[in-house]
C-alpha cells in the first residue's frame, strides 16, 4: 500500500513539474528591427535644428505652452471626456480578465450544502416516528494540471490584451489632450484674426470719413469715396466668417469638456493670443519617439496576444488533467456538522 501511495505521489509531483515547464505553441518574441535600421534613425542623428531637443517629452506635454488656462482645460477634459472614460472602463475589464485567468492556475474550491425533511413511522426500530430534518454539507477541491501550458498561454493572452488596452487608453488620452489644445489654439487664432480684422474695419471707416471730407473740399473725386466704401464693405464682410470659425472651435472645445456646445468657458471669447512653445521641443531620439507611440505599442501587444492564442488552440487538442477531491457530512443538527 505504501508503494502505491509513493508511486501516486511521484506521478503527481512529476506532472506538476512538467506542467510548469511545458507550453505548446510558439514562444512570442517582439519583432526585431531590420538589420539596416539603427537604434537612432539617420534623420535624427543628422538633425541639428535648435527647434528640437534630445530631451524626453514630458508626460504633460501641453504644459510646454506655459498657458495656465490651457492646462486647466486639458485637465478638465481628461477627467470628464466620455471616450476616455470608456477606454478606462475597458482597461479595468481587461485587468479583471487577467486576474480571472491567473486564479484558474490555483486550487479551486467549492462549498455546497442542503437540507431535507422526511417523515418516518414507528416500526419499533431506528428512529421514532415523526418528522426529521437532515443537514448536508460538503467541500470540494480541484486542481487542473497545466500539462501542455494551456493555462499559461491563457494568462499570456489575457495580459497582452490588457497591455494593448492600456496602450489604447494612452492613445485616447493623447487624442483628447491634442484635440483640446487644437480647439483652444483655433479659437485663440480666430480671436486674433478677428481683432486684426476689426481694427482694419475701424481704420477704413476713419479713412472713408477723411475721403468724404476731402471730396467735399474738392481734394478727392466721388470715385475715390466709392472705392473707400467698397473696401470698407469688403473688410466688414471678412469678420463674420472669422467669428463663425471661433464659435466652431469653442463648440468643439465644449464637447471635449463634456458640456453642451454653447456652454464653453466665457473667458475664451476674449482669447486673442495664440499659444506657442517658447523653448526647444523635446522629442528624444528616434527609437524613443517610436516606442512612445501608443498605436505601435497596441499593435505589438495585439501580436503577442494572437501568438499566445495559437498556443491555446494547440493545447485544446490535448486532453486536460485535473485532480479533485471532496469531503461531506450529514447530521440532524448544525452542531453535528462541525
Residue ranges and their predicted role:
Residues 133-141, 183, 285:
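Hydrophobic, lipid-facing positions within transmembrane beta-strands of outer-membrane proteins
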Residues 85, 105-131, 142-171, 190-193, ...:
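Small/polar (Gly/Ser/Thr/Ala-rich) solvent-exposed segments
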Residues 2-79, 135, 155, 159, ...:
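Terminal intrinsically disordered/low-complexity segments used for targeting and assembly
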Residues 298-318:
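Long hydrophobic segments that form regular secondary structure
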Residues 71-74, 88, 98, 184, ...:
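Extracytoplasmic/secreted envelope proteins and their assembly/folding machinery
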